[in-house]
Amino acid sequence: MEKKYVLAIDQGTTSSRAMLFDRQGKVAGVAQREFGQIFPQPGWVEHNPREIMTSVYTTITELLNNAQIDAREISGIGITNQRETAVVWDKATGQPIYNAIVWQSRQTKDICTQLKEAGHEQMVRDKTGLLIDAYFSGTKVKWILDHVDGARERARKGELAFGTIDSWLIWNLTGGKVHVTDYTNASRTMMYNIHTLEWDAELLEMLDVPAQMLPEVRSSSEVYGMTQTQYFYGEQVPIAGIAGDQQAALFGQACFEPGIAKNTYGTGCFMLMNTGDKAVASKAGLLTTIAWGIDGKVEYALEGAIFVAGSVVQWLRDGLRMFGKASDSQAYAERAGDNDGVYFVPAFVGLGAPYWRSDIRGAVFGLTRGTSKEHFVRAAVESMAYQTRDVLTAMQSDSGIELKELRADGGAIANDFMAQFQSDILNVPVLRPEVAETTALGAAYLAGLATGFWSSREEIAKQWAVDRRFEPNMPEERREQLYAGWQQAVEATMGFRIS
């Protein structure tokens, strides 16, 4: 039977999606299922790994049924996932020994403090391109091994497996036959040396994580194994692509050349710039990470992670009940006319790149009796654009590359006001692609290249098309005045303490 589609599994922080893409890179079907969030203590975020798997199985079944697709028409499966989230499971039973500790969770912050006090920061930075932070997987694995009775000894005996979510999905989809990850996910663990391309003995010793529990690291585009027949109505489908969500979006946006960058506006905001075969060491608070590895060649990226972006709009809607739908924020922001001197620093969980301050909290400045709800909403929406400029300034400083355009994706960029304001504040064109689902598309492309569904990156690059291009049209004096106000607000926020 003719292969007509590639299936992408997009396993995110709050939901799992299965999406079909045709040869033109267009969406041919989608199914989505949310799953529960677990908050055992303030600042802790966990997921039930079995519930994640159930959500994935359900979306695959719904997608095939709704689209009336024969599994034999699927060329391969690409997997993209919430990065850094860590799972440890029993190899014999396949059962997790603890919940998945989510990337957002701060429950390992004390471990991070101890590692910093022991003087490990520079070594971690040099080997991994990362900072010592609770964000990354390594301290999460250590926490599980520290807190589950007998876990570390069982791991040393080879009885336990660790994986980021991609590894967990593949283990289950292949019936426990395949324990792998790819370069992109490995590079987010704080245990993987991005220069030697191997699990690093010194890092593992620092965290007291046994090497026996780690997955094999493979390229981002190859056939890793076949699914069990029960998931695809008696058929086996090759799993052929893996990338962490932000790297998948970089690939889906066809950012194949050094100096091309994308920004994903989701719960948080993640800007990545392709730096080619050069691992650029940041001096400005950014992360150095692996963009992807294909056909024996690894390419790198600079990354700036903003912790709160689209979630600020959700907070206005659900927490403050300022409007009914997230999309209403555009009308409120436009009605305001300007921000009336109001600045909103959404440091709900601290500030990410380039500041990396987890000890501060959100703040609002410039309120007067004349401040309206519209001004407040506008200031919140504008905060996404200001934070992006913070990251872009750092990125251009590190790379020595002046950005010519920014490719944007994610839910918040559907807001035309936000997209235009972003272009104005950056003084750079912002390009919104026709296919908004760039994360899933990137995973599909990686799988399709491995199975021959697509022939080359050149073929993929030709499919990338612009829905709308936003050109900067704000006078320079006004742009710099607004940004200077933001910088003052951030400085004041960082100086404020509640004892």
Curated annotation (Swiss-Prot):
Its EC number is 2.7.1.30. InterPro entries: ATPase_NBD, Carb_kinase_FGGY, Carb_kinase_FGGY_CS, FGGY_C, FGGY_N, Glycerol_kin. ADP binds at residues 13, 17, 267, 310, 411, 415. Sn-glycerol 3-phosphate binds at residues 13, 83-84, 135, 245. Keywords: ATP-binding, Glycerol metabolism, Kinase, Nucleotide-binding, Transferase. Pathway: Polyol metabolism; glycerol degradation via glycerol kinase pathway; sn-glycerol 3-phosphate from glycerol: step 1/1. It catalyses: glycerol + ATP = sn-glycerol 3-phosphate + ADP + H(+). Inhibited by fructose 1,6-bisphosphate (FBP). Glycerol binds at residues 83-84, 135, 245-246. NCBIfam families: glycerol_kin, PRK00047.1. Key enzyme in the regulation of glycerol uptake and metabolism. Catalyzes the phosphorylation of glycerol to yield sn-glycerol 3-phosphate. Belongs to the FGGY kinase family. This is Glycerol kinase. The lineage of its organism: Bacteria, Pseudomonadati, Pseudomonadota, Gammaproteobacteria, Lysobacterales.
